[in-house]
């Protein structure tokens, strides 16, 4: 049985307009995917026992009340701090039921995951898209399933994510790939970037949004560097990161200029969007700016 943690609120107003979101929603706390680079592990977020997934108490009741009180609807984003399709979601169904509430109250949604389980809820995505903007994103950082298993050990491998996204895109949902982080010295090759963009095109994804580097904050930095030493003992990646990145918050690939050039050329070739403004305009097209909530 999943552990629970108390919660007073779940849907919060966002600032900055990340992917055009008006609200943010995290039903679960923590994540068990084991991704070695996860920024949510950082000390600044204050999540204790990060690798243990816990559900927020009375999550659906809180979400129902908060949606009902909103004067205007908008896009509710989820997946920023904890993957909404962790293994517990298969039986708990909290994300699915939350999406049903989002649909019932006339809101749009932006869902991010690394789990192929996301395809299960395609029917609800389609219902939401009938009245509001609906966006589905999946994080993919490498085309190599073997490398994926090393750096993202407890979640669907890249090929499974591509398959899931293809099914969702086939149903008419606006989909895309979050190409981030791209780990310097490990994933920052032209072959990897080209492979992801071309696969995005093949599966019907509309955009790829990249970040050619990785964030290294307190707590997460130490975890990441330790894992590099464990997984790739012969590569000396830890030493290379320490020498190249120093104590910087963001470690950008030394190949960033070349990668951006290759990336934009490939996106242009296949009509893949990559600019945030263009992506938001495209997936919200035809819905209007805001909608009144009559519930």
Label for each model-derived stretch:
Residues 1-6, 12-13, 191-295:
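Auxiliary Fe-S-binding modules of radical SAM enzymes
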Residues 143-145, 152-154, 167-189, 210-215:
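Conserved strand-turn element in the central/C-terminal portion of the radical SAM core barrel
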Residues 116-119, 183-194:
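Active-site glycine- and acidic-residue-rich loops that bind
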Residues 83-85, 182-185, 250:
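Short histidine/acidic/glycine/proline-rich micro-motifs that form metal-
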Residues 126-129, 165-170, 264, 268:
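Surface-exposed amphipathic alpha-helices with a cationic face
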Residues 106-107, 173, 205:
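A structural motif
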Residues 1-137, 141-149, 158-162:
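Conserved Radical SAM active-site core
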């Amino acid at each position: 049985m999943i552990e629970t943690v108390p919660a007073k609120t779940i849907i919060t107003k966002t600032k900055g307009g990340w992917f055009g979101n008006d609200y943010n929603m995290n039903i679960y706390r923590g994540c068990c995917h084991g991704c070695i680079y996860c920024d949510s592990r950082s000390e600044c977020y204050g999540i204790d026992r990060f690798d243990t997934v816990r559900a927020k108490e009375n999550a659906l009741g809180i979400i129902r009340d908060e949606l009902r009180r909103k004067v205007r609807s908008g896009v509710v984003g989820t997946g920023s701090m904890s993957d909404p399709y962790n293994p517990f979601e298969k039986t708990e169904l909290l994300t699915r039921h939350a999406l049903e509430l989002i649909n019932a109250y006339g809101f749009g949604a932006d869902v991010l995951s690394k789990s192929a389980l996301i395809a299960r809820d395609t029917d609800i995505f389609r219902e939401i898209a009938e009245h509001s903007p609906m966006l589905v994103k999946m994080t993919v950082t490498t085309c190599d399933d073997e490398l994926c298993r090393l750096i993202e050990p407890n979640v669907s491998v890249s090929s499974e994510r591509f398959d899931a996204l293809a099914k969702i895109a086939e149903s008419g949902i606006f989909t895309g790939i979050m190409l981030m982080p791209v780990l310097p010295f490990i994933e920052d090759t032209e072959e990897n970037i080209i492979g992801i963009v071309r696969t995005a095109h093949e599966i019907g994804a509309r955009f790829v949004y990249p970040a050619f580097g990785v964030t290294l904050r307190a707590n997460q930095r130490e975890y990441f560097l330790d894992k590099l030493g464990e997984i790739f003992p012969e590569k000396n990646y830890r030493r290379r990161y320490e020498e190249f990145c120093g104590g910087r918050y963001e470690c950008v690939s030394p190949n960033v200029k070349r990668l951006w050039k290759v990336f934009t050329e490939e996106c242009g070739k296949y009509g893949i969007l990559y600019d945030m403004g263009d992506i938001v305009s495209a997936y919200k097209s035809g819905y209007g700016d805001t909608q009144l909530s009559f519930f």
